[in-house]
Amino acid sequence: MKLKFIIGVVGILSACGFTNAPSLDTTQEEQDNNWVIGPFHRPEGVNPVISPQPTEFYCPMRKQQVKWEESDTFNPAATTKDGKIIVLYRAEDNSAQGIGKRTSRVGYAESKDGIEMKRMASPVLFPAEDNFKDQDWPGGCEDPRVAMTEDGLYVMLYTAWNRKKARLAVATSRDLKNWKKHGLAFDKAYNGRFNNLFCKSGSILTKLKGNQLVIDKVDGKYLMYWGEYAVYAATSDNLIDWYPVLDEKNELMKIIQPRKGHFDSLLTECGPPAVRTKHGIVLMYNGKNSGKTGDADYPANAYCAGQLLLDGDDPYKVLDRLDKPFFAPEAPFEKSGQYKDGTVFIEGLAYHKRKLYLYYGCADSRVAVAVCDDVKKLKIK
């Protein structure tokens, strides 16, 4: 497969609409930060790998056939099973106009090479006649992230959207096609203190073991990073019931938050599952740029991707953070659709055949992939 390098750890082409953008040469920041996972490059001529199509299924909520992925397909999770990459992507029907006004469902696609996708005709997670209608009717199930335990249990963290409040929810599966919903991630924490908290974007800590990224622990507990306007953390004994980490004032502990003058000046939203390496814990995240107080190298409201290094023994301690994005909008389909200011929204990371495949949403409209050939940094020792 012929690959065209388009982004190092930082930098994009000014010719693609980003004035004053850094060049594609390896930057000093990349050279100084040997913990950064990458570089990632887009395979030439293959993206987007998932686009909308008029597939129909019977919707138990609407009690009729609906074209469940007709409008947009984006924000994908990714993992591997039986030698294939599995991509679980958010799909929107055409029931309304405007961001957040349609119904979202999670679709399934599989690939032997990470590029050519075989898709299921029906979604695998959606608003159903179940005990969770108050959580995901009518907005649906959004923005999945998926990680796997060593014994083959897949855990999905997704946003349950009832059009009143977005909340982080949990589902599990053994085959990635049949999912069991468990409800809100923070439902049992602190006597229900965070039941109605607006929360989303959960990234469970993983590590590379053999040929698979698997869920890891810190001090005997599972760990996830979560959040949109800031990055927080939570721990769990069972991967279903999660307890947000609190600070000395008994408030949510902020690990990072937006920075003036940077690409992440409006939002810092968790990306794919975090990864333990020999350098510590690497968290990839999505940053939104402010037009007034952000980085002038990137358009206002553009979504770019950053990386953060945390201490492997003290996972709430920040050791380093990139000042520039390692991945940013470049292709036309990343700068058109629902977010015309430009969006690469990373959510899925899969280790497959000695490469890393990073799946991302393009302007809330398509799914694309970038590839990293250098996976030595994933080694724990």
What are these regions (language model features)?
Residues 1-5:
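Positively charged n-region of N-terminal signal peptides that target proteins for export
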Residues 7-15:
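Bacterial N-terminal signal peptides
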Residues 18-139, 147-266, 275-339, 353-381:
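Beta-rich carbohydrate-recognition and catalytic domains
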Residues 334-336, 344-347:
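Short glycine-rich, acidic/polar surface loops and turns
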